[in-house]
Structure formats: C-alpha cells, structure tokens
Curated annotation (Swiss-Prot):
Organism: Arabidopsis thaliana
Ranges where the record places region Disordered: 1-36, 149-196
Residue window of motif Nuclear localization signal: 156-160
Location of the protein in the cell: Nucleus
Protein's UniProt keywords contain Cell inner membrane: no
Superkingdom of this protein's organism: Eukaryota
Gene from which the chain derives: LSH6
Function (record text): Probable transcription regulator that acts as a developmental regulator by promoting cell growth in response to light.
Record's compositionally biased regions (Basic and acidic residues): 1-16
Protein name stated in the entry: Protein LIGHT-DEPENDENT SHORT HYPOCOTYLS 6
UniProt GO molecular function: DNA binding
Disulphide-bridged cysteine pairs: none
C-alpha cells in the first residue's frame, strides 16, 4: 500500500539522491539574541514615535541618550537625589520619594546589544550612534552618579598580572667535576636523588 507522499524520498532513510544533509528547523535564538531583537524593535518604535519621526540614518548619539533618558520612567532602581537624607546609603532604613531609574548595568548591557544589532542590520561601524563618544560619557556619568547616590563604589576591576617567574641558577657542574667523572656533569647521581 502506497502512502500519499510516496513520490518523495526520505532523507532519513538515505534514499535521497540530493545533498546528504538533513535540513532541520532553524534553532531557537538564545536569550541574548531574543533580547537583542526586542531591544532593536523597541528602539525602532521609539524613532517612529519620535516628534518628528526620526529615520535611523539620521540618528545620532544625542538621540540615543534621549532614548536612555526616556527608558528611566520604566526603571526599578531607587536613585537618591542629593537632598535626600539617604543619599549615599546602601540600605536606607525607610522609604523615600526619590525616583526610580534604569540601573547603570542595564543601560550598559542595552547599549551593547543595540550596538551589535545596528551593525547586524546593515549599519556601518563608523556611523554607529550607539558607539558614539557622547553615549560612553553619558553612561560613565550615570554609573558615577548612581554609585554616589546609592553608596556603592564602582571600582574598575584591575587586571591580574600573571605571576612573574624567577629563575634561580644553581651551579651543579662545579661539584660534579670534583668527583672526577666528566660524563656525569649536570646529571644527578642516584645517591643524591634518593633521600637518606
């Protein structure tokens, strides 16, 4: 009895005269790739809703900073203002009315994803607004101000230098030559190799 698709060959059984590979459905994107796509779509939507609407080709570092400031309204990190009695306290004892903002780490990661997405979507690296100097300066200022406001020092991680190897030269040859055997120069004797 023949099935309805008997005219097709089965690549799994090996009777396919074509290429020897089996095509599989595209792999599901990683969390990073999914987040990058969502971030990219959010940024494009922001440009579309911008007054006046802004084309990606006309986008600059200033527009990226404006976008980051816009995102602050959705933040969940309490950032104390200078006049707040809890300014500089890591664990304030009671609630205050200071604003919630996007955490510096979240903004930094977002910019990294958008920077990559821009180039993956045809943007030139030399015109990438997410890599603009103004954006880097803004992120640095956000990091420093949040560190002061929350009492958390953000210290740059110092690179661990590889340990320096000190070589010590031991002159074994002079003690060997005193034994009178020129062939054993530099080679340990069995008596020296075995502990007493």
């Amino acid at each position: 009895m023949e099935s309805a698709d008997s005219g097709r060959s089965d690549p799994v059984k090996g009777d396919d005269p074509g290429p020897s590979f089996v095509s599989s459905p595209p792999a599901t994107p990683s969390r990073y790739e999914s987040q990058k796509r969502r971030d990219w779509n959010t940024f494009l939507q922001y440009l579309k809703n911008h007054k006046p609407p802004l084309a990606l080709s006309r986008c600059s570092g200033a527009h990226v900073i404006e976008f980051l400031k816009y995102l602050d309204q959705f933040g969940k990190t309490k950032v104390h203002v200078a006049a707040c009695p809890y300014f500089g306290h890591q664990q304030p004892p009671s609630p205050c009315s200071c604003p919630l903002k996007q955490a510096w780490g979240s903004l930094d990661a977002l910019i990294g994803r958008l920077r990559a997405a821009y180039e993956e979507n045809g943007g030139r690296p030399d015109s990438n607004p997410f890599a603009a100097r103004a954006v880097r300066i803004y992120l640095r200022e956000v990091r420093e101000s949040q560190a002061k406001a929350r009492g958390i020092p953000y210290e740059k991680k110092k690179r661990k230098r590889p340990p320096t190897v000190t070589t010590v030269r031991v002159d074994v040859a002079s003690s060997r030559q005193s034994d009178g055997d020129p062939c054993n120069v530099g080679a340990p004797s069995v008596a020296e190799a075995v502990p007493p």
